[in-house]
């Protein structure tokens, strides 16, 4: 799947890089999660590097990102993204459970911890992801060791969040 995707996208000059998500908790069939297997991560990173000369970052799970970031660096990733959402479950009164990813400001302290610890272990850039809501959050992530940030959940509240953050309006 990765090979098909990268080969299909390589033809477009306007694509300057990729983020390879190794930990999305929002998938239907969760029989095996690849982030639990170091060999799988090693093979994905090595294969991605063989397929492209473009920049690529490995988006790592929050609970093993510190451990696997050096492996991503060793096998050719240009950066790591920390972190993805945390898996969670919501219970409804009709006794239905819905699982998915927990994101937003609640995960920011854990994301900052992971960046702080990982920055001691690797030289490649860390992209912060998780709970960035305003300019202060961006500063915290950068001061903790990130070189860039991703903006996600806040876009549901403010579709122009990036502009507002850049202008220090958030």
Language model region names:
Residues 33-37, 58-61, 103-107, 127-131, ...:
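Glycine- and other small-residue-rich loops at beta-strand/loop junctions that grip anionic moieties
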Residues 2-8, 63-75, 117-123, 128, ...:
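Catalytic cores of alpha/beta
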Residues 10, 45-53, 73, 115-121, ...:
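Surface-exposed amphipathic alpha-helices with a cationic face
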Residues 15-19, 55-59, 78-81, 125-127, ...:
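Structural preference for beta-strand elements that scaffold enzyme active sites
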Residues 22-24, 79-90, 131-132, 137-165:
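Glycine-rich phosphate-binding active-site loops on the catalytic face of alpha/beta enzymes
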Residues 2, 41, 45, 65, ...:
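Aromatic/hydrophobic pocket-lining residues that form the small-molecule binding cavity
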Residues 1-33:
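Active-site beta->alpha loop and helix N-cap motifs at the rims of alpha/beta catalytic domains
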Residues 25-36, 68-120, 124, 160-164:
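Glycine/Thr-rich beta-alpha phosphate-binding loop at enzyme active sites
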């Amino acid at each position: 799947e990765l090979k098909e995707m990268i080969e299909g996208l390589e033809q477009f000059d306007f694509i300057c890089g990729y983020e390879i998500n190794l930990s999305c908790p929002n998938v239907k069939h969760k029989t095996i999660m690849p982030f639990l297997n170091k060999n799988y991560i090693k093979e994905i990173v090595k294969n991605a590097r063989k397929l492209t000369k473009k920049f690529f970052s490995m988006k790592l799970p929050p609970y093993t990102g510190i451990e696997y970031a050096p492996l991503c660096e060793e096998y050719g990733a240009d950066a790591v993204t920390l972190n993805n959402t945390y898996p969670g479950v919501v219970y409804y009164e009709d006794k239905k459970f819905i699982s998915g990813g927990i994101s937003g400001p609640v995960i920011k302290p854990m994301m900052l911890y992971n960046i702080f610890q990982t920055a001691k272990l690797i030289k490649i850039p860390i992209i912060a992801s998780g709970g960035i809501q305003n300019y202060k959050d961006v500063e915290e992530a950068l001061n903790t060791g990130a070189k860039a940030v991703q903006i996600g959940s806040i876009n549901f509240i403010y579709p122009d969040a990036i502009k507002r953050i850049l202008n220090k309006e958030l």
